[in-house]
Amino acid sequence: MRIDIITVVPDILKSPFEASILQRAIEKGLVEIHLHNLRDYTTDNYKQIDDYQFGGGAGMVMMIEPIDKCISELKSEREYNEVIYMTPDGATLNQKTANSLSLSENIIILCGHYKGVDQRVRDQFITKEISIGDYVLSGGELGAAVLCDSIIRLIPGVLGNETSALTDSFQDNLLAPPVYTRPSEYKGWEVPSILTSGNLPKIEEWRENQAYERTKKLRPDLLDDE
């Protein structure tokens, strides 16, 4: 998979890909991350990428020309499955979306800033708009990092245990069950005995029941979506 991220501040996006699972995925050649500074696609001496709104109003708007140049250059080199715009207006990121995007070969992610992008960018180039929640950040970079993490960990070979991602919360519209590790007793707090019994069918049944009860208590809305 190749992910091209268009941003005004590429430095924000360097560190997430230089550690842990994402770094290993890149080193294994399972994913390529390419950061594109939008200012490199400007034509003026000031490298301007934003301007005042037509009709007046507070806040600057990202200009269409440098975005067009960047996206068009990338598209001239390869085909892309999606051109994604990170925006609070978008559909909230969920596991279903991450699962779907993880099957893509090439993705472009555009990070918004200021009051957002000229609407013509959204009309002409964007195929999917994604939000990471009903709140506003200074830019789309952190959202892009979250999106990339949620996608990359699903690519076969990225995680050490191939079944690990399949048992994460939300994969079956359920939260994950409680998990425990050694020691089996600590300060009088004991691990449920079923988990140390060695009875795998009973353990699986316990986990399914716990996942359902936990979801019912903490996220009943997920059960309503079934």
Swiss-Prot record:
Catalytic reaction(s) noted: guanosine(37) in tRNA + S-adenosyl-L-methionine = N(1)-methylguanosine(37) in tRNA + S-adenosyl-L-homocysteine + H(+)
Gene Ontology BP, a term: tRNA N1-guanine methylation
Subcellular location: Cytoplasm
The species this protein was found in: Christiangramia forsetii (strain DSM 17595 / CGMCC 1.15422 / KT0803) (Gramella forsetii)
EC primary class: transferase
Protein family: Belongs to the RNA methyltransferase TrmD family.
Main location: cytoplasm
Protein name per UniProt: tRNA (guanine-N(1)-)-methyltransferase
EC number(s) given by UniProt: 2.1.1.228
InterPro entries named in the record: Alpha/beta_knot_MTases, tRNA_m1G_MeTrfase_C_sf, tRNA_m1G_MeTrfase_TrmD, tRNA_m1G_MTases_N, tRNA_MeTrfase_TRMD/TRM10
Subunit structure: Homodimer.
Pfam families registered for this protein in UniProt: tRNA_m1G_MT
TM spans (from-to): none
